[in-house]
C-alpha cells in the first residue's frame, strides 16, 4: 500500500484514560495530490507521484509549472513517488488524506536525520572510551587500531571512524499510531521519528507489522 508525505510538527504527550503518559510525535499530513500516474507500458513500472503543501509562484520553475498544470494540481513543495502493487488504481488529480490510516495500527516513518557535523567515533558509532589514567595520557577518545599490518596493508572500506554524522535518509520502523485527527490533518505517532521540526517525513504502513 502507498504512504503519505507529511511534515514533522514536534513532540508532545497524551494521556490514556488510565492516566498513562504516551510520548507522541505530531505529523501534519496535508492532502497529498496525485500529480502523475506511472505505468509499466510508459515508464516500466507502476507508481504514483504526489505533491503536497504549496510553493511560491516565483519559486516554481517553468518545467515544474508545466508538469503541475498538465496534472491540474496546485504546485507543491516537492515531488514524491510511491510504487503501486497490482490492482491499485489512481487517477491524476486525486487527493489522498490522512484518513487512509484509520484502519492501520503500525507505520514506518522515513525522514532526514538531524545533521551533527563532523563527530568522533565515540559519538558517531558509540565506541567506548579508553582509560582516563593508568598510563594513558593522549588517547582517551581515540578510536584505537583501524586495521592490521603489511597484510592487507590498507584500511578496509566501511571502517567505522570519525566523520560526518547525520543528515542522511533513515527509517524508523513499527511505530504505533496513537490517534488520527482527520479534521486537522494530524497523525499522532508513538515515539520519535527521524528529522528536525518542520522536516518532510514519509509515513507508510509497516512492512514488519
From Swiss-Prot:
Drop me one GO molecular function for this one.
Answer: structural constituent of ribosome
Q: Which GO terms describe its biological process?
A: translation
Identify the keywords attached in UniProt to this record, alphabetized.
Methylation, Ribonucleoprotein, Ribosomal protein, RNA-binding, rRNA-binding
Q: How is it modified after translation?
A: Methylated by PrmB.
Instruction: Give me the Gene Ontology terms describing cellular component.
Output: cytosolic large ribosomal subunit
As stated in the Swiss-Prot or TrEMBL entry, residues carrying the post-translational modification N5-methylglutamine are 150
Domain of life, source organism:
Bacteria
Keyword Chaperone part of the UniProt annotation: no
Q: Which InterPro entries match?
A: Ribosomal_uL3, Ribosomal_uL3_bac/org-type, Ribosomal_uL3_CS, Transl_B-barrel_sf
Tell me which Pfam families the record gives: Ribosomal_L3
Give the quaternary structure.
Answer: Part of the 50S ribosomal subunit. Forms a cluster with proteins L14 and L19.
Q: What does this protein do?
A: One of the primary rRNA binding proteins, it binds directly near the 3'-end of the 23S rRNA, where it nucleates assembly of the 50S subunit.
Protein family membership: Belongs to the universal ribosomal protein uL3 family.
What is the protein's name according to its record?
Large ribosomal subunit protein uL3
Instruction: Tell me the organism's taxonomic lineage.
Output: Bacteria, Pseudomonadati, Pseudomonadota, Gammaproteobacteria, Vibrionales
Amino acid at each position: 500500500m502507498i504512504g503519505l508525505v507529511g511534515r514533522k510538527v514536534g513532540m508532545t504527550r497524551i494521556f490514556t484514560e488510565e492516566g498513562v503518559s504516551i510520548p507522541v510525535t505530531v505529523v501534519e499530513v496535508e492532502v497529498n495530490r496525485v500529480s502523475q500516474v506511472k505505468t509499466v507500458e510508459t515508464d516500466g513500472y507502476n507508481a504514483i507521484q504526489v505533491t503536497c503543501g504549496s510553493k511560491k509562484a516565483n519559486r516554481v520553475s517553468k518545467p515544474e509549472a508545466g508538469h503541475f498544470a498538465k496534472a491540474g494540481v496546485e504546485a507543491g513543495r516537492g515531488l514524491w513517488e510511491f510504487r503501486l502493487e497490482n490492482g491499485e488504481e489512481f487517477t491524476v488529480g486525486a487527493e489522498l488524506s490522512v484518513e487512509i490510516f484509520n484502519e492501520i495500527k503500525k507505520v514506518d516513518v522515513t525522514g532526514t536525520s538531524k545533521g551533527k557535523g563532523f563527530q568522533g567515533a565515540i559519538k558517531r558509532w558509540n565506541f567506548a572510551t579508553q582509560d582516563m589514567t593508568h598510563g594513558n595520557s593522549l588517547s582517551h577518545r581515540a578510536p584505537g587500531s583501524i586495521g592490521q599490518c603489511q597484510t592487507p596493508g590498507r584500511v578496509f572500506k566501511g571502517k567505522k571512524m570519525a566523520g560526518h554524522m547525520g543528515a542522511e535518509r533513515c527509517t524508523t520502523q513499527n511505530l504505533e499510531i496513537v490517534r488520527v485527527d482527520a479534521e486537522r490533518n494530524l497523525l499522532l505517532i508513538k515515539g520519535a521519528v527521524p528529522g528536525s521540526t518542520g522536516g518532510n517525513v514519509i509515513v507508510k504502513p509497516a512492512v514488519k507489522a
